[in-house]
Amino acid sequence: MALAGAGSQLRTLVWSACLCVLVHGQQAQPGQGSDPGRWRQLIQWENNGQVYSLLNSGSEYVPAGPQRGETSSRVLLAGAPQTSQRRSQGGPRRRQAPSLPLPGRVGSDTVRGQTRHPFGFGQVPDNWREVAVGDSTGMARARTSVSQQRHGGSASSSVSASAFATTYRQPSPYPQQFPYPQAPFVNQYENYDPASRTYEQGYVYYRGAGGGMGAGAAAVASAGVIYPFQPRARYEDYGGGGGEEQPEYPAQGFYPAPERPYVPQPQPQPQPQPQPQPQPSDGLDRRYSHSLYNEGTPGFEQAYPDPSTDVSQAPAGAGGTYGGAGDPRLGWYPPYAANVPPEAYVPPRAVEPQPPFRVLEPPYLPVRSSDAPSQGGERNGAQQGRLSVGSVYRPNQNGRGLPDLVPDPNYVQASTYVQRAHLYSLRCAAEEKCLASTAYAPEATDYDLRVLLRFPQRVKNQGTADFLPNRPRHTWEWHSCHQHYHSMDEFSHYDLLDASTGKKVAEGHKASFCLEDSTCDFGNLKRYACTSHTQGLSPGCYDTYNADIDCQWIDITDVQPGNYILKVHVNPKYIVLESDFTNNVVRCNIHYTGRYVSTTNCKIVQS
């Protein structure tokens, strides 16, 4: 009986506990509808193979008006990953700094300019589903609100809190410092003209770095603390009043230029005929010498006046002070200022044409032979002299530069000697016609001895331009014996003259060499070599030919002992233009004994 009574009491207690739990649950049902934690809305979407869910505990529509402090809503973003890979603790988090309210900026404007991007660059308002269009107070309140607490981490890695979704609609503990009205949110598909951006005087602007600096700046701003960065200079600081004030100096427009009056070009005055040059007292012909020979010479300027110094002036009645104003290329341009007096146009000095464009009278042609040519030959030689010799380069008349070859007489005098060699060792030189005519006779053998007068040669280009070969590059001749190209037919003439009569006693030859910069003075660079495409002689450089190379000689096998004159002539036919042709010849006195030679009195002469 006792056990039966105890069992019945135990059953009674169990049923009483269940009834209490049931009654308590039924009493909690009426308040469930007002639970702020209840999820009322669910939005799902898929991105990159992952399904996301947006849960909202608030109502879908919020009426316009002041926000009630006792109500709050929660927004939760949940993602369900498709793969089994688990992320770090807390799941993926979106970090986004709340935007600061900028006066005059539309809600959809981006930082870069007026271009509207649909919900891009973090410019979407936080309450885009809760604030009605046209409610400026709600927009300002939503944009200035700062998140105070975040949703705690969930046990599931697929549920994460968003920076903009975990904001509780609670009143801020700090008073709002910037109650400026904001422009309402504008639909991104609506055609509108964005308002011009202006800056207010009383507003304090803050600058924040990327990341969470924006949130920190907003929190400090809401607390009334000035951020420790200097504000950027506003447009008003430079004198611009938002477009209301006119600038002190208006912008200069484009106005048509006034027409230039036409003035006929003055007719050139006839030049007087040059008088014949007075005969110099020393007997030297200086018509083709450098200009330094004529400086300070009385009577030279009168005999050969400079046409560039005689500038014809316009007549007084032909347009006043406007010289050649009809043509912009030749005339006068009006000044920009109206009060500046016009200046007369002064034409540039006429540049003296370089050879062979200018013809001098009387013509002059150096004669290599002692025999006087005929009358017709003089006429033909005069025409040839006009084309080949040309004028002298004068650097004071803005003309182009020309080379100037000068042989070294001391170099020739220091190393002249006699050599005897067998004909079989001179085969390469024989191919280039560097021997006397008796070496090519049928009775000549390889064991015949040839007597050679050897001497070196060093030529300097002391002009202002490169001395280049006259032959085109594709016509240069290749010599297999010497293994180089010959770029000129006649670079130098070597002659042996009789000291008493001046007649040529040894057959000179036409030396054809390849041009190169052997050595250069200090400050000049070597730019040419004896190759197939870079032959020439630079200014300030020397082309040196030692006495032991082929063809650097005169064959004197048939010459008797005696006194002679060695003549070395550079650029003998004046094929390449030079600024001075009077310094191309070197003469030396030679005393030949039959076994050796002595060289004296080497100097530069005219011919």
Curated annotation (Swiss-Prot):
Segments passing through the bilayer: none
Modified residues (2',4',5'-topaquinone): 545
Region feature (Interaction with FBLN5): 334-402
GO molecular function, one term: oxidoreductase activity, acting on the CH-NH2 group of donors, oxygen as acceptor
Residues that coordinate or bind Cu cation: 482, 484, 486
Disulphide bonds in the chain: 428-434, 481-530, 514-520, 541-551, 588-602
Organism: Mus musculus
Quaternary structure and interacting proteins, as annotated: Interacts (via propeptide) with EFEMP2. Interacts with FBLN5.
Skewed-composition ranges (Low complexity): 82-91
Keywords in alphabetical order: Cleavage on pair of basic residues, Copper, Disulfide bond, Extracellular matrix, LTQ, Metal-binding, Oxidoreductase, Secreted, Signal, TPQ
Enzyme Commission code: 1.4.3.13
Pfam families reported for this sequence: Lysyl_oxidase
Reported consequences of knocking out the gene: Mice do not deposit normal elastic fibers in the uterine tract post partum and develop pelvic organ prolapse, enlarged airspaces of the lung, loose skin and vascular abnormalities with concomitant tropoelastin accumulation.
Cross-link Lysine tyrosylquinone (Lys-Tyr) residue location(s): 510-545
Name of protein: Lysyl oxidase homolog 1
Subcellular location, record wording: Secreted, Extracellular space; Secreted, Extracellular space, Extracellular matrix
PROSITE patterns: LYSYL_OXIDASE (PS00926)
